């Protein structure tokens, strides 16, 4: 008669099942952490489940830094701290730690310690299909959570396609920019030039009627602190583009009424999207730096705000001989306003600011 086969398991990943175990997850984790092994433990995850008769059992994944050889089938036994009871597990080497972790995660009553060590076995034909992984990523709720899912379940894609995956997820999970709340109401701007007010009335005063198909834009030039930015931003929902053009979904929305272009040098706008923005063109693309092309819905006017002087003034820029063609186009698509005084009376906005502070207090 051959001698009984000696117990021996050698693996980096151990899957333990305690069929009848009344210990809490926390107590079990503490005892497993304190086991002395020649190989460092890297990760432990425990799930507590109930049998149909209400008796609890535990599933455990233990990951080691390297292969650990276990020759004592009582090594992973747990002990009750309150009574004389031992809990003996079924011990298996786990071929795919990802599959075991997914199995343990299914009921949600879990606790873990350490950093999960990703393996590629699941992605090479285990239980976790690519479609399942990406569906799980879409349901993760955020870019970082989705990336964590794919890092664990689709490591090859995560490494080789990281840039594309991250870019796509950022677009998928992009939130609309928070609406800007103006500190002053439009009614506080009492010195708005007639032509400037007429432009605003023609575009914003249509009520329920459809806006013009190709609305005219407006270029407002004036000294600093004349109120032009506050006026422009108080008219309604808008995109605010300042200093440079940024069509990132975190700051730019296709569901606004107009664009505010503030302190963007005319030579820069000429190189980018002068005609698209000032001409209220529809359905055009912008190639963002280090990103994929962004589709712009368009069809809305721009309020361009600038200061006088070389390099800032749009009027001076268009008066240059090399910009004659662009000037002729712009005259047909925008009106020009030069401010000679602030758009507000200081007493009007001061009283409104006081009222706002009282309402907030």
Swiss-Prot record:
The cofactor required is: Mg(2+); Mn(2+)
Q: Which intervals of this chain are the motif RCR-1?
A: 15-18
What keywords appear on the UniProt entry?
A: ATP-binding, Covalent protein-DNA linkage, DNA replication, DNA-binding, Endonuclease, Helicase, Host nucleus, Host-virus interaction, Hydrolase, Metal-binding, Multifunctional enzyme, Nuclease, Nucleotide-binding, Nucleotidyltransferase, Transferase
The listed location of motif RCR-2 is 57-59
A Pfam family hit: Gemini_AL1
Gene Ontology cellular component list: host cell nucleus
Localisation per UniProt entry: Host nucleus
| Gene Ontology MF, one | metal ion binding
Q: Which SUPFAM superfamilies match?
A: Origin of replication-binding domain, RBD-like
Highest taxon, organism lineage: Viruses
Binding-site residues, a divalent metal cation: 49, 57, 59, 107
Q: Where is the active site?
A: 103
Q: Cite the cofactor comment.
A: Divalent metal cations, possibly Mg(2+) or Mn(2+).
Which region ranges are annotated with the description Oligomerization? 156-176
Q: Where is the CRESS-DNA virus Rep endonuclease domain?
A: 8-116
Could you say which residues form the signal peptide? none
GO biological process terms, semicolon-separated: DNA replication
Quaternary state and interactors: Homooligomer. Interacts with the replication enhancer. protein (REn). Interacts with host retinoblastoma-related protein 1 (RBR1), and may thereby induce the transcription of host replicative enzymes even if the cell is not dividing anymore. Interacts with host PCNA. Interacts with host SCE1 protein.
The domain section of the record reads: There are 3 rolling circle replication (RCR) motifs. RCR-2 is probably involved in metal coordination. RCR-3 is required for phosphodiester bond cleavage for initiation of RCR.
Record protein name field: Replication-associated protein
């Amino acid at each position: 008669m051959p001698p009984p086969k000696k117990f021996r398991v050698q693996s980096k990943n151990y899957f333990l099942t305690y069929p009848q175990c009344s210990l809490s997850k926390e107590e079990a984790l503490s005892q497993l952490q304190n086991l002395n092994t020649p190989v460092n433990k890297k990760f432990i995850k425990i799930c507590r489940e109930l049998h149909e008769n209400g008796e609890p059992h535990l599933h455990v994944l233990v990951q080691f830094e390297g292969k650990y050889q276990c020759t004592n089938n009582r090594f992973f036994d747990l002990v009750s701290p309150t009574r004389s009871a031992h809990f003996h597990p079924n011990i298996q080497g786990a071929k795919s730690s990802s599959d075991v972790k997914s199995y343990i995660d299914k009921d949600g009553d879990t606790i873990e310690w350490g950093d999960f060590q990703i393996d590629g076995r699941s992605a090479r034909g285990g239980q976790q299909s690519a479609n399942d992984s990406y569906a799980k990523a879409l349901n993760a709720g955020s870019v970082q959570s989705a990336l964590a899912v794919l890092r664990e379940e689709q490591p090859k894609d995560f490494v080789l396609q990281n840039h594309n995956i991250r870019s796509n997820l950022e677009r998928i999970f992009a939130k609309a920019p928070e609406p800007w709340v103006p500190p002053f109401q439009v009614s506080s701007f009492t010195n708005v030039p007639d032509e400037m007010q007429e432009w605003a009335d023609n575009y914003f005063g249509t009520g329920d009627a459809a806006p013009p198909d190709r609305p005219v834009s407006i270029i407002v030039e004036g000294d600093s602190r004349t109120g032009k930015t506050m006026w422009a931003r108080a008219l309604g929902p808008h995109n605010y583009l300042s200093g440079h053009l940024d069509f990132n979904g975190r700051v730019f929305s296709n569901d606004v009424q107009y664009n505010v272009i503030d302190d963007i040098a005319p030579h820069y706008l000429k190189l980018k999207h002068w005609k698209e923005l000032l001409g209220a063109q529809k359905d055009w693309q912008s190639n963002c730096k280090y990103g994929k092309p962004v589709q712009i819905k368009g069809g809305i006017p721009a309020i361009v705000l600038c200061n006088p002087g070389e390099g800032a003034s749009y009027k001076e820029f268009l008066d240059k001989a090399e910009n004659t063609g662009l000037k002729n186009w712009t005259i047909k698509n925008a009106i020009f306003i030069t401010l000679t005084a602030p758009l507000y009376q200081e007493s009007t906005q001061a009283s409104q600011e006081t009222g706002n502070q009282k309402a907030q207090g």
